Amino acid sequence: MNEKNSDEINYDFKVDSNLNHTTSHLLAAAIVQLYPNVKLGFGPAIEEGFYYDFEFENPLSKLELLKIEKLMKKLASMNLKMVKVDGSNYDFTNKPYKKELYDELKQKGQEITFYSLVDTNGKEIFTDLCAGGHVESTSKINNFKLLSLAGAYWRGNSNNIQLTRIYGSSFYKKDELENYLKVIEDRKERDHRKIGKNLGIFTFSSLSGLGFPIWLKKGMLIKRAIEKEILYLDRKYGFEEVLSPHFGEESLYIKSGHLAHYQETMFKSLEVENEKLIPRPMTCPHHIIIYDAFPRSYRELPLRLSEQSRLYRYEKSGALTGLERVRTMDLTEGHIFIRQDQIKDEVLNMINLIQETLKIFKIKIDHVALSLRDNDKEKFFDDDQMWDQAESALKEILDQNKIDYIVEKGEAAFYGPKIDFQVKTVLNNIITMSTIQLDFLLPRKFNISYIAPDGSKQTPLMIHRGLIGTYERFVSILLEQTKGNFPFWLSPSQVIVLPIAKEFKEYAFEIYSKIFKQNFNVEIDNRDETINKKIREAQINKYKYQIIIGKQEMENKTIAIREYGKVQTITMDLESFIEKIKSQRDSKE
């Protein structure tokens, strides 16, 4: 479902960090001239530009950015050189944030450097405490834009004062800047929060809790369509669907190790009589309980368990972002219990499942990452033999099946290495879509076993399998990719019937009923409004097909069809139309 970008917008733009870092100095130089009592914070280059933090005497309005830009351009035209200077005489008066950084670097014994913007006469226009990384002259700074204002706590600590952060971006060429500004506007149009609200897909309420999404009718239609495909594929690949409680006793997560490793992202326990119940952040411990509910034989393995699970994870309120970052989420989770000799076959089986799943949703894999541990003994379970065995097994599987991959040290789960399938979204973000995680640890912690052919008790291995991440994040990605214009089979707004006037409503309901009986997402707009208004609203709500019913259609027992995004209508009989949309649904168009 990777919708191609417009020919006019290039999301693969390049941002030069040295150019942007120098532009941040230019911004600070202009600010100091315009607001002499300002206090300077940091001004680094970032992924898509730069920012600089300031403490102003009075609040800064966005309208003032144009005035600041104007002075920046004037300074840039002076061909100021960026020169490393001796900072021994640097005046820290009214510069508490610079002084704090200076003292910190000095205490650590780190190199301290200063850079100045110097005019053609050798006069220092602006000097800053800085580690370097610049272009040699402001003559390179011709195409930049100050983009926005934001609040930012000093050093990222909410206990500190909130400074004013000015964001901007700088490019060498005019067309590069123009393209980037188009990217920003396109991102606004693709904001899943805006689209989701406008199309009635989801909502939030402070009364139901921050970060707890409410799925509306259209959102549930999308979610159920996705879920239907996932459930079918799970059955196809041999999974047994189970359902486990939303809570776990605190001792469960102590035993699993999750409380020790993920306590900051888990909700606090709820004391009920003599129990401490925690909203579950994952289902793997619950699935181990299911495995251990009965004696197991080697003949039963692999045992594949899947669940459409509701999870709860604590996110700070500032990190919550629409459906993308929430505190409760639905996840299609899978856990497979296997024998040692089944590792290769089962991991390959899961690779095939992931590839088939992503193909259905037309999602292209950007790259595969083999995530391994690093030397952090606190971050990862300390058992060298286990790790070496697990990591070499996954590497061998990828190599033998000629699957290209990159190695990412330190990105493994605390209990074992993993294979991550990375996807590039239409907004050029790389995200982990699917994962296969090999786990030698949890089965040991819970002392689960199976009876081997020789009658001995053996410990199974466990594979954690993720297909599409959470439904919340997946739908947010689909909204961004499609701008809400879903492919027909996934659309919550497949067909709407629009009678032109009252006298055609009976025939319109007849059409509606026949389409509804074929299990399509169909609506009827029988309001006493003009047909033009009905069509306009149907287009806004992205109905894939609008069926217009008037005198001619009623007399000829036909329908007039207008497709989303098109002006012309096509007349056909209802049976042919139903066959057409059945074909679209079945072929996943």
UniProtKB/Swiss-Prot annotation:
<feature type="binding site">
    <location>
        <position position="335"/>
    </location>
    <ligand>
        <name>Zn(2+)</name>
    </ligand>
</feature>
<keyword id="KW-0694">RNA-binding</keyword>
<keyword id="KW-0963">Cytoplasm</keyword>
<dbReference type="InterPro" id="IPR033728">
    <property type="entry name" value="ThrRS_core"/>
</dbReference>
<keyword id="KW-0479">Metal-binding</keyword>
<feature type="region of interest" description="Catalytic">
    <location>
        <begin position="191"/>
        <end position="487"/>
    </location>
</feature>
<dbReference type="InterPro" id="IPR002314">
    <property type="entry name" value="aa-tRNA-synt_IIb"/>
</dbReference>
<dbReference type="InterPro" id="IPR004154">
    <property type="entry name" value="Anticodon-bd"/>
</dbReference>
<feature type="binding site">
    <location>
        <position position="464"/>
    </location>
    <ligand>
        <name>Zn(2+)</name>
    </ligand>
</feature>
<keyword id="KW-0547">Nucleotide-binding</keyword>
<dbReference type="GO" id="GO:0000049">
    <property type="term" value="F:tRNA binding"/>
</dbReference>
<dbReference type="GO" id="GO:0006435">
    <property type="term" value="P:threonyl-tRNA aminoacylation"/>
</dbReference>
<dbReference type="InterPro" id="IPR012947">
    <property type="entry name" value="tRNA_SAD"/>
</dbReference>
<comment type="function">
    <text>Catalyzes the attachment of threonine to tRNA(Thr) in a two-step reaction: L-threonine is first activated by ATP to form Thr-AMP and then transferred to the acceptor end of tRNA(Thr). Also edits incorrectly charged L-seryl-tRNA(Thr).</text>
</comment>
<feature type="binding site">
    <location>
        <position position="284"/>
    </location>
    <ligand>
        <name>Zn(2+)</name>
    </ligand>
</feature>
<keyword id="KW-0436">Ligase</keyword>
<dbReference type="GO" id="GO:0005737">
    <property type="term" value="C:cytoplasm"/>
</dbReference>
<keyword id="KW-0648">Protein biosynthesis</keyword>
<dbReference type="GO" id="GO:0005524">
    <property type="term" value="F:ATP binding"/>
</dbReference>
<keyword id="KW-0030">Aminoacyl-tRNA synthetase</keyword>
<dbReference type="InterPro" id="IPR045864">
    <property type="entry name" value="aa-tRNA-synth_II/BPL/LPL"/>
</dbReference>
<dbReference type="InterPro" id="IPR006195">
    <property type="entry name" value="aa-tRNA-synth_II"/>
</dbReference>
<keyword id="KW-0067">ATP-binding</keyword>
<keyword id="KW-0820">tRNA-binding</keyword>
<protein>
    <recommendedName>
        <fullName>Threonine--tRNA ligase</fullName>
        <ecNumber>6.1.1.3</ecNumber>
    </recommendedName>
</protein>
<comment type="subunit">
    <text>Homodimer.</text>
</comment>
<dbReference type="GO" id="GO:0004829">
    <property type="term" value="F:threonine-tRNA ligase activity"/>
</dbReference>
<dbReference type="InterPro" id="IPR002320">
    <property type="entry name" value="Thr-tRNA-ligase_IIa"/>
</dbReference>
<dbReference type="InterPro" id="IPR036621">
    <property type="entry name" value="Anticodon-bd_dom_sf"/>
</dbReference>
<dbReference type="InterPro" id="IPR047246">
    <property type="entry name" value="ThrRS_anticodon"/>
</dbReference>
<dbReference type="InterPro" id="IPR018163">
    <property type="entry name" value="Thr/Ala-tRNA-synth_IIc_edit"/>
</dbReference>
<dbReference type="GO" id="GO:0046872">
    <property type="term" value="F:metal ion binding"/>
</dbReference>
<dbReference type="Pfam" id="PF03129">
    <property type="entry name" value="HGTP_anticodon"/>
</dbReference>
<keyword id="KW-0862">Zinc</keyword>
<dbReference type="Pfam" id="PF00587">
    <property type="entry name" value="tRNA-synt_2b"/>
</dbReference>
<comment type="similarity">
    <text>Belongs to the class-II aminoacyl-tRNA synthetase family.</text>
</comment>
<dbReference type="Pfam" id="PF07973">
    <property type="entry name" value="tRNA_SAD"/>
</dbReference>
